[in-house]
Amino acid sequence: MADGEVHKLRDIIEKELLEARRVFFSEPVTEKSASDAIKKLWYLELKDPGKPIVFVINSPGGSVDAGFAVWDQIKMLTSPVTTVVTGLAASMGSVLSLCAAPGRRFATPHSRIMIHQPSIGGPITGQATDLDIHAREILKTKARIIDVYVEATNQPRDIIEKAIDRDMWMTANEAKDFGLLDGILFSFNDL
């Protein structure tokens, strides 16, 4: 298949998925991927306000700020959003899986969910004052993420703090038992 045919096929698939009100987030959380998802979500909202949207997530996580941009936009929609994890929802991907209202958060049977505290990648340089500013900011970010998990799971704050101290990997069933999911989805017809 030539490159032009591949792009045409991708466009057809994307169009069909949007017509079915399915938005797929199958990549790391970046400014670009967040922007693309937000545009699709708002396209569907403007096209038919209040009609349900399914947000399918398969993401290793990524940028906290980009992820919370998607989160905030989903919360602003009048269309009810159902999240479905398929494959992996790790780090910020797991936070995105919680942006749906209670009762609308699902995963496919073989999905995995990983929660942890935020981290800063790469070498950090600067004056002691700058490092102190970064440390305070990451602690604020950690508190925001803990708030999301506490609200979503109804777990006590100390349980969440302990859970995210290191990477906590869960199967779909374990994530459901922990309160991160409302159910295991065996068919999209069940939505």
From Swiss-Prot:
- Species name: Chlamydia pneumoniae
Q: Which Pfam families match?
A: CLP_protease
- Taxonomy, superkingdom: Bacteria
- What are the top taxonomic ranks of the organism? Bacteria, Pseudomonadati, Chlamydiota, Chlamydiia, Chlamydiales
Entry's EC annotation = 3.4.21.92
Family stated for the protein in its record: Belongs to the peptidase S14 family.
Recorded GO molecular functions are: ATP-dependent peptidase activity; ATPase binding; serine-type endopeptidase activity
Give UniProt keywords alphabetically: Cytoplasm, Hydrolase, Protease, Serine protease
One GO cellular component term of this record is:
cytoplasm
Catalysis: reaction(s) = Hydrolysis of proteins to small peptides in the presence of ATP and magnesium. alpha-casein is the usual test substrate. In the absence of ATP, only oligopeptides shorter than five residues are hydrolyzed (such as succinyl-Leu-Tyr-|-NHMec, and Leu-Tyr-Leu-|-Tyr-Trp, in which cleavage of the -Tyr-|-Leu- and -Tyr-|-Trp bonds also occurs)
Q: What is this protein called?
A: ATP-dependent Clp protease proteolytic subunit 1
The protein's matches in PANTHER family, at most eight in alphabetical order, are given as: ATP-DEPENDENT CLP PROTEASE PROTEOLYTIC SUBUNIT (PTHR10381), ATP-DEPENDENT CLP PROTEASE PROTEOLYTIC SUBUNIT, MITOCHONDRIAL (PTHR10381:SF11)
